[in-house]
A protein has these predicted regions:
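Thiamine diphosphate
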Residues: 132-144, 168, 172-183, 200-321, ...
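Non-catalytic terminal/interface segments that mediate subunit docking, oligomerization
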Residues: 348-489, 567-575, 581-583, 588-591, ...
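Acidic-glycine-rich active-site phosphate/pyrophosphate-binding loop
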Residues: 40-51, 84-86, 123-145, 417-431, ...
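A glycine-rich helix N-cap at a beta->alpha junction
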Residues: 119-129, 207-217, 244-245, 484-497, ...
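A short, small-residue-rich loop immediately preceding and capping a beta-strand
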Residues: 61, 97-98, 149-152, 179-197, ...
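Cofactor-binding active-site loop characterized by glycine-rich and histidine/acidic residues
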Residues: 72-210, 423-424, 456
Length: 697
């Protein structure tokens, strides 16, 4: 006889040994539709395999988040078994659907799916090493640790922001190469936390505005946060919120496989707007005393609770043991995409030779020779004309020669296009009407811009760059950090890089931002001194496949301080711009302060003191050079070194040695014209020269 549900008066026909039901405030019962046997693998059995692996791995690690994987197992089973286009044997197939676990704390959901569907590097041993040093199964999913992990998530909302970039990249590439080779969806599992985060709201409104019809978000609507019920901190109606942002919205019982199937099918047919499917779920589904509570969010369930969950779920198997019928069914799902991939391969082979060559090149991330040729010609022109441009203007002029020969680039700005100089003549704005546009008007959404650029870079075939004022790197720093952590080619065009921006004052003058950005590992900060260096810095950023770049650019005009030459001198991070290698004094500067160092050298020459000026656009690149080169540029230990930068001096001691001084900012800026500010704060050629004189005595 069927057993009585543990929280409702109705009978469920799952098994006579025990059942599990939805735990909601209204205590609505779940109506099970599948009987569990040893011979068949019903959807509920397959979902329970995910639940069991999540419980077991978290318990073994004595750390982790079992609640979300248990709650979203039914939804994930439907998605992977009926809709997601992938081939586990070819995880990097360019036309696969992208699955993003924005709620990255539920990483065992993803790891379980990757193991069950047959990704070669996600073995059972890896699941057993969950959260251990050196394992592919880190606490939160990390891009590059294992196949099938499309992006690094964990900081909530980032995956949702990434998804906008994934969907944009798919749409732009489909316009270029056609639906025969680019025809996939982006699916996201997001939780309450993702929707509470500011980056989540920015991403939601941007996706709705752009009409990203192949973006489908599955919202784990479990009503629980770490502190307890979400009613403690929020009372908004997410469904109305998404609808107001231009999304197609549905709500379903997340434990009703048929309802979830219908909803995803309907969402896939909505082509003019992104889709939200709010899946009402029970966090920790199946746990006899903890389901539906915050206790399942971020702690192991405990042996007794797991035993009870096994009984409730009818899962009478040892830890990490998956019945053959269930395992076989999952492996068939992992191989189901082979036929679609083979058809795609034929379509790819049928492309014209030029289109095929470009598609392959862009997937590899290679830069065509035409870019180097264009930059070389541009540098020669600059050397002849010697313009006095702000480096933001120099950046735009560099892009004017790069973008026509590099179709990979997708530019944008956070409502500062005219100030960042990020749009060029050949780029059209992306919109619902123009889905081929390579320029994104992000609006005042700096965080979503950065997160979306990460998504575009991760998708492949796109090199994204986007601009805002440098002070607003604070608004997108979490995504910049993830760019560096993942090692993706994203180019941040950050203008108005110092007190040189002038009258807007200290709220807009970045003084601590250069050291703060330099503190991020695997991020190269490039601060060019003139138009030629700016062109070289763009070349460096484009060639760095696995390193994101920040271009720190001026508002104020700067003179051309060097000739062209074939060699990219900025590529070594620092070089002697003027003077002799044997000079006993080094005047070191970056960006707009290089001209001050050159003027200070002239002042010292009048005193009979020989100095060499070092232009240092990138600390990171210079640090990567051999000791012999660094010593050549900086001089020996006894060399007098004076550094100048219109920023705080944090970190400069690394380069100054025993006889060094720094000329720069000691606090926040002020509102006035740039020349007046430089004089007011003592950032002058005379101040540099005086520091050198003092140290040379």
């Amino acid at each position: 006889m069927p057993a009585r549900c543990w929280l409702c008066p109705s009978f469920c026909a799952l098994t006579g040994k025990g059942v599990v039901v939805m735990l909601r405030a209204i205590r609505k019962p779940i109506r099970h539709k599948h009987k569990m046997t040893d011979q068949t693998a019903a959807p509920r059995d397959m979902a329970n395999a995910i639940r069991a692996l999540a419980m077991d791995a978290v318990q073994l690690a004595d750390s982790g988040h079992p609640g979300m994987p248990m709650g979203m197992a039914d939804v994930a089973t439907v998605l992977f078994s009926k809709f997601l286009k992938f081939d586990a044997s070819e995880p990097n197939w360019p036309d696969r659907d992208r699955f993003i676990l924005s709620a990255g704390h539920g990483s065992m959901l993803l790891y379980s799916l990757l193991h069950l569907t047959g990704y070669a590097d996600m073995t059972l041993d890896e699941l057993k090493k969950f959260r251990q040093l050196g394992a592919r199964t880190a606490g939160h999913p990390e891009y590059g640790h294992a196949s099938g992990i499309e992006t690094t998530t964990g900081p909530l909302g980032q995956g949702l922001g990434n998804s906008v970039g994934f969907a944009l990249a798919e749409r732009i590439l489909a316009e270029r190469f056609g639906r025969d080779v680019v025809d996939h969806y982006t699916y996201v599992i997001a939780g309450d936390g993702c929707l509470m985060e500011g980056v989540g709201q920015e991403a939601i409104t941007l996706a709705g505005h752009l009409g990203l019809g192949r973006l489908i978000v599955l919202f784990d609507d479990n009503g629980i946060s770490i502190d307890g019920p979400t009613s403690l901190s929020t009372s908004e109606d997410h469904k109305k919120r998404f609808a107001a942002a231009g999304w197609h919205v549905q709500a379903v019982d997340g434990h009703d496989a048929e309802a979830v199937t219908r909803a995803i099918r309907k969402a896939r047919n909505v082509t003019d707007k992104p889709s939200l499917i709010a899946c009402k779920t029970v966090i920790g589904y199946g746990a006899p005393t903890k389901a539906g509570t915050a206790a399942t969010h971020g702690s192991p369930l405990g042996k007794d609770e797991i035993a009870g969950a096994r009984a409730k779920l009818g899962w009478n198997h040892e830890p990490f043991d998956i019945p053959e019928a269930v395992f076989s069914a999952w492996r068939k799902i992992g191989a189901r995409g082979k036929s679609a991939r083979r058809k795609w391969t034929k379509n790819l082979a049928a492309m014209g030779p030029e289109d095929r060559a470009e598609f392959d090149r862009r997937q590899k991330g290679d830069i065509p020779p035409a870019v180097d040729e264009a930059i070389a010609a541009f540098k020669a022109k600059l050397a002849a004309e010697k313009p006095s441009w702000a480096t933001r203007k120099s950046s735009q002029e560099a892009l004017e020669v790069i973008n026509p020969v590099l179709p990979d680039t997708v530019g944008g700005s956070a409502d500062l296009t005219g100030s960042n100089n990020t749009k060029t003549a050949t780029l059209k704005g992306a919109s619902r009407a123009d889905t081929a546009g390579r320029y994104i008007y992000y609006g005042i959404r700096e965080h979503a811009m950065a997160a979306a650029m990460n998504g575009m870079a991760l998708h492949g075939g796109i090199i994204p760059y986007g601009g805002t004022f440098m002070v607003f790197t604070d608004y997108c720093r979490p995504s910049i950090r993830l760019s560096a952590l993942m090692g993706v080619r994203v180019i941040y065009v950050m203008t108005h890089d110092s007190i040189g921006l002038g009258e807007d004052g200290p709220t807009h003058q970045p003084v601590e931002h250069l050291p703060a950005l330099r503190a991020i590992p695997n991020l190269q900060v490039l601060r060019p001194a003139d138009a030629i260096e700016t062109a070289e810095c763009w070349q460096i950023a484009l060639e760095a496949k696995h390193v994101p770049s920040v271009l720190a650019l001026t508002r104020q005009n700067l003179p051309t301080v060097r000739g062209a030459g074939d060699e990219n001198l900025c590529a070594k991070g620092a070089y002697i711009l003027a003077g002799e290698e044997t000079a006993p004094i080094r005047l070191i500067a970056s960006g707009s302060e290089v001209q001050l160092a050159l003027a200070a050298r002239d002042l010292l020459a009048k005193d009979g003191l020989a100095a060499a000026v070092v232009s240092m656009p990138s600390w990171e690149l210079f640090a990567a050079q051999e000791d012999t080169y660094r010593n050549k540029v900086m001089g020996g230990d006894g060399t007098v070194r004076v550094a100048c930068e219109a920023a705080t001096g944090f970190g400069w001691e690394r380069w100054l040695g025993s006889k060094g001084a720094f000329v720069g900012m000691k606090g926040f800026g002020a509102s006035a014209k740039a020349p007046e500010l430089y004089k007011h704060f003592g950032i002058t050629a005379e101040a540099i020269a005086q520091a050198a004189r003092r140290l040379a005595q």
